[in-house]
């Protein structure tokens, strides 16, 4: 079976945090999430995106989902 590349999702949370000038501790509190989970989002190491967490982040940062996520299409072979 051929190994297909569908592209990837880039998480831009770290950029939003810097842009808004909010601390990670404050954001974690506002979004009701653990600091370690927030760090995984910032580093792009989270393996499963939880829509409830994404909604809380959008609410806490007063932003849209496209401000946090970007689809990177696959490179042509």
Regions found by a protein language model. Name each.
Residues 52-67:
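DNA major-groove recognition helix of helix-turn-helix/homeodomain DNA-binding modules
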Residues 2-3, 69-77:
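Short, charged recognition helix plus adjacent turn
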Residues 14, 25, 55:
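Residues within the helices of the helix-turn-helix
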Residues 17, 28, 58:
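The alpha-helix within a helix-turn-helix
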Residues 19, 46-49, 60:
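Helix-turn-helix/winged-helix DNA-binding modules
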Residues 9-11, 50-54:
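Short alpha-helical elements of helix-turn-helix
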Residues 1-21:
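A short, Lys/Arg-rich alpha-helix, primarily the initiator
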Residues 21-40, 45:
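Short alpha-helical DNA-recognition segment
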